[in-house]
């Protein structure tokens, strides 16, 4: 039996690592899952891995923005004397495999695409090599990026994609997150994405491994079995579907699939439960969403609005008209379904008029929590390829940057991000806190309706309205400032004044949100809200758990 250490973010149960862990267990290998959620975890994670002395260290490199952290971890392992095999995996590692193999000799290999079978084969080969004392013939393993004797990258053929019906279910060690005593756990009912958005690496990743067939689904009976098992063995009542596409193309097919899943769950005698899903605006259909809420008990649906500007929809290749965004929000409002969304306010082609269009959308959907930011250039995406072809990128494969389409748009972006950074991206970002507050409310309303007052639900919506409209006011102020060609000498005073106003609004909302959380906790009388009552809060399923997740 070999020991394998798996390193990655465990802010919630990391399904990619946990599927690999269960596949390794099925092959007779032991694993330790070592959380590396933030910079402060680095020393603990490093000492933990060194103490384990594993034959293989697998590092999850799914998020490009954290690539430096995880590559530094590999370097630190070597500096501290670790001589075993270090492999990387994930979206970014797959796309940047040749560059990483070239630039980081500390990395032994990269597992490309879906890696369950690749990691098992790699571990088996390392174990065999340890027994015989001969080098492992790794070039025979599909799905690896290796290094030739002269240092050049060598990519073995693409791996065979695992059969979702035969994969061992993900390792569920450790305590789950909980909200008012109701366990929360992520799962997937499918893999892949049938869309082709220009800014997203997910579709490109699956297209690379399975051209033209990049979306696979599990049978509903298999999904229902997993849900019931988790409820019975771990106390899971809230199931968060992390599918890139929980919805399949076609409203009729979605209605049939969701109805079949509800039937399967009822047949198995599942207790009271709730679901959380993600949807595209084009997925939002009255009949489908009625089943989603009434029979699958959906308490939160993230809707991928992304932008309401026609130009943005074209640049991002969303292939849905802006009117569909409003229809989606109107239906969520009619069903009283908690919805949240993000807006990619800045993209390579954004104009001031596009900004104003999206500001109007924030006001239109003000009671639904939202956030905004810039489109980033991720490895493997069509948008990155386009920007490189146009000569508009700077940086390197670790982090590409670009300028917006005009100096005035660059100015709007710079001023906005300076003023809004704390609200949108800070450690205590209120835009995320509000999403968590609404999640707590919906959990309470669904599982404890007898104690939840209607005015608490309205208070949650009102806090979102205040924040959304305040943000819209702030963005409009930035646009006005830029439109009048205000001199640069006025920028600091303007941003400081705007930021001060934003912080004052945030303080008022934060106080009311804490009071609301206390009311919920006291009324329910068991467990805690998912968002902490204090300065450090978490978005749904983004609560860092300082739990050592070892076998």
Show which residues each predicted segment covers.
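A general structural detector for well-ordered alpha-helical segments in enzyme core domains, enriched
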Residues: 20, 45-48, 69, 73-77, ...
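Radical SAM enzyme core and accessory elements
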Residues: 2-7, 42, 46-55, 106, ...
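N-terminal [4Fe-4S]-dependent radical SAM core
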Residues: 141, 146-190, 507, 546-549
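Glycine-rich beta-alpha loop elements in corrinoid/cobalamin-binding modules
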Residues: 3, 9-10, 16, 20-23, ...
């Amino acid at each position: 039996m070999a020991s394998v250490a798996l390193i990655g973010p465990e802010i919630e149960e990391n399904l990619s690592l946990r599927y690999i862990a269960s596949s390794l267990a099925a092959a007779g290998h032991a694993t330790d899952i070592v959380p590396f959620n933030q910079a402060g975890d680095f020393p603990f994670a490093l000492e933990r891995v060194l103490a384990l002395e594993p034959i293989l260290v697998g590092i999850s490199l799914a998020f490009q923005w954290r690539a430096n952290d995880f590559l530094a971890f590999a370097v630190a392992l070597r500096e501290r004397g670790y001589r075993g095999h270090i492999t990387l995996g994930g979206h970014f590692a797959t796309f940047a495999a040749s560059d990483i193999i070239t630039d980081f000799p500390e990395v032994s290999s990269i597992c490309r695409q879906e890696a369950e079978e690749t990691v098992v084969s790699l571990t088996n080969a390392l174990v065999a090599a340890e027994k015989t004392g001969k080098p492992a013939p790794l070039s025979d393993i599909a799905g690896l990026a290796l290094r030739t004797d002269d240092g050049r990258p060598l990519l073995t053929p693409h791996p065979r994609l695992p059969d979702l019906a035969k994969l061992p279910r993900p390792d569920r060690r450790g305590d789950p997150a909980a909200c008012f005593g109701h366990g929360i756990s992520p799962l997937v009912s499918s893999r892949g994405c049938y869309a082709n958005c220009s800014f997203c690496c997910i579709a490109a990743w699956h297209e690379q491994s399975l051209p033209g067939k990049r979306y696979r689904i599990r049978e509903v009976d298999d999904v229902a079995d997993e849900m019931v098992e988790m409820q019975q063995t771990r106390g899971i009542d809230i199931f968060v579907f992390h599918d890139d596409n929980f919805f399949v193309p076609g409203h009729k097919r979605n209605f049939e699939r969701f109805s079949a899943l509800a039937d399967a769950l009822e047949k198995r005698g599942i207790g009271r439960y709730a679901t959380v899903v993600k949807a595209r605006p084009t997925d939002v259909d009255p009949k489908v969403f009625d089943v989603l809420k009434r029979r699958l008990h959906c308490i939160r649906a993230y809707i991928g609005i992304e932008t309401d500007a026609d130009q943005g929809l074209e640049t991002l290749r969303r292939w849905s008209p802006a009117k569909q965004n409003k229809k989606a929000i109107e239906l969520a409002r009619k069903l009283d379904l908690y919805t949240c969304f993000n807006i990619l306010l800045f993209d390579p082609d954004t104009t001031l008029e596009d900004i104003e269009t999206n500001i109007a959308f924030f006001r239109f959907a003000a009671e639904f929590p939202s956030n905004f930011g810039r489109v980033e250039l991720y490895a493997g995406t069509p948008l990155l390829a386009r920007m490189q072809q146009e000569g508009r990128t700077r940086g390197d494969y670790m982090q590409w940057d670009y300028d917006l389409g005009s100096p005035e748009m660059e100015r709007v972006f710079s001023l906005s991000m300076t003023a809004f950074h704390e609200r949108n991206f800070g450690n205590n970002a209120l835009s995320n806190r509000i999403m968590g507050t609404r999640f707590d409310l919906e959990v309470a309303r669904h599982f404890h309706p007898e104690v939840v007052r209607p005015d608490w639900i309205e208070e949650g919506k009102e806090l979102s309205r205040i924040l959304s409209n305040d943000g819209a006011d702030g963005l409009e102020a930035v646009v006005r400032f830029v439109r009048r060609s205000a001199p640069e000498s006025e920028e600091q005073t303007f941003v400081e004044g705007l930021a001060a106003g934003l912080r004052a609004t945030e303080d008022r909302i934060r106080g009311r949100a804490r009071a609301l959380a206390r009311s919920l906790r006291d009324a329910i009388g068991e467990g805690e809200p998912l968002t902490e009552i204090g300065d450090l809060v978490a978005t749904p399923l983004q609560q860092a758990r300082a739990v050592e997740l070892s076998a």
